[in-house]
Every structure is written in structure tokens, then in C-alpha cells.
Amino acid sequence: MQVDLLSSAQSAHALHLFHKHSPLVHCMTNDVVQTFTANTLLALGASPAMVIETEEASQFAAIASALLINVGTLTQPRAQAMSAAVEQATRSQTPWTLDPVAVGALDYRRRFCVELLSHKPTAIRGNASEIMALAGVANGGRGVDTTDAAANAIPAAQTLARETGAIVVVTGEVDYVTDGHRIVGIHGGDPLMTKVVGTGCALSAVVAACCALPGDTLENIASACHWMKQAGERAVARSEGPGSFVPHFLDALWQLTQEVQA
């Protein structure tokens, strides 16, 4: 199994495209992470919108550059709104990304996410346990936490990518991005990133935005993982713990965009 690495030049090119196109991202995400997700997108140069009412969600999915479905705080009314948005995104050819939060631990959201797969997401982003559960390989995970190493989920990610046509991202100490054939590994980041709520969910929003960019979608998505890990490393070097990490992280994302424009 060959795992390719992303070059700095590829990452910088993708970030230049990101800043140039400034995708409008329709984030149907969980209640815990909305502000952090929006600020992450803004720091990188995208435009976030959190539209959740069923009628509006369907309408906005046709307007947005990309759609994110994150099931972290799933309810039946929210599931209805998400389904409507995904159906409209499919009709409008709006790329959409699925973040199957805790899908391995809870039956209702697992069934819902499996139903959504029939609408062919452009990308799927989850931890190892979530990706393996969604692929039907195993049930597991401790709520939103993974109990598996990311590398162990590569075969499941490849299967899921081939079955759905999505680019699948497995995040962990090393992130892996695959279209079912190619695999790109992204190293970096810091364990402190797991002590802040929302870093993975925010990454999913950035992945969604990258699906709207021209060029090689797999490389663009792998670049999103690289930016987040880079920013995490810079933020950890300047912070004293989780509380001071967040503002330094947002600053680091912003600085990355300024560097590629220089």
C-alpha cells in the first residue's frame, strides 16, 4: 500500500486557490462548534453561513459553493433539514461533505448517515472509528472519540471511497486522504489539538470548502489537513494550554493565508 506525501508547493497552491475563490460554505454543523467553525473558515478566507431551517436550508444549498453536513448534535427536525439540503445540493450539483460524528456509537445517526450516502457525498471526513463504522467494518468509538489508529482505517476508507465516489479523510496523528486508489498521508499537528472542542469539525468545514475549488480535489482536501496541522503546531508553540490555543490557532491560519499572498 503506497502512501504519498503532500508537497509544500501543492499545499501553498491550494491555499492560494482557496483565498482567491473564497468559497461560500453552508455549514449545517453541530451546536457545540458553530462559532469556532465559522471563525476557522473566515481566517482562511472563506465565507461561512449557518442556515438550519428546513425550507431555508434547501434554498441555500443551491446558492452555496459547498455544503457541510455534521451530525454531532443530530435531532429529527435537524435531520429533516439536512436531508432537504443534501437533496437540493445533489440537484444543484453543489459539492457536499459528510462528517459522521459518533456514527459508530449511536444507531440513529448511523442509519441517517448511511441513508445520506445514497446521495453521493463529495467528501467524507471522520476519525478512524467513524470511518470504519460507516464502511460497515466495525462498530466502535467512545462517543466522538476514536478507539482505532487512523492507519487501521485505510482499507475501510478505500472501500467507502470506491462505493460512494467520495474522497474519504481519516484523521488522527497522521491524516489519510483517499479516493479509493490514491492515498495521501499528512503528518504534523499536536496532541493539544484534541483537547479543544471543534478542531475536527472545523476541518470538515474546510474540507467542504476545498471541494468547491478547481483542480485536483484530493490534493486540495489533503492540503486542508496540512493547513490545520501547520496552524496547530504554530499555535501550540505560542500557547500555554487549551484556553490560549484557540486565538493563536486562528491567528496562525490567517498568517498562513498572508504568507501565500506575499
From Swiss-Prot:
GO terms for molecular function: ATP binding; hydroxyethylthiazole kinase activity; magnesium ion binding. Pathway: Cofactor biosynthesis; thiamine diphosphate biosynthesis; 4-methyl-5-(2-phosphoethyl)-thiazole from 5-(2-hydroxyethyl)-4-methylthiazole: step 1/1. It comes from the Bacteria. Its EC number is 2.7.1.50. The keyword Manganese does not apply. The keyword Transmembrane helix does not apply. ATP binds at R125, T171. Its cofactor is Mg(2+). Substrate binds at M50, G198. It is an enzyme of class 2 (transferase). It catalyses: 5-(2-hydroxyethyl)-4-methylthiazole + ATP = 4-methyl-5-(2-phosphooxyethyl)-thiazole + ADP + H(+). GO terms for biological process: thiamine biosynthetic process; thiamine diphosphate biosynthetic process. Keywords: ATP-binding, Kinase, Magnesium, Metal-binding, Nucleotide-binding, Thiamine biosynthesis, Transferase. Catalyzes the phosphorylation of the hydroxyl group of 4-methyl-5-beta-hydroxyethylthiazole (THZ). HAMAP family: Thz_kinase. Belongs to the Thz kinase family. This is Hydroxyethylthiazole kinase. It comes from Escherichia coli O7:K1 (strain IAI39 / ExPEC). The lineage of its organism: Bacteria, Pseudomonadati, Pseudomonadota, Gammaproteobacteria, Enterobacterales. The gene is thiM.
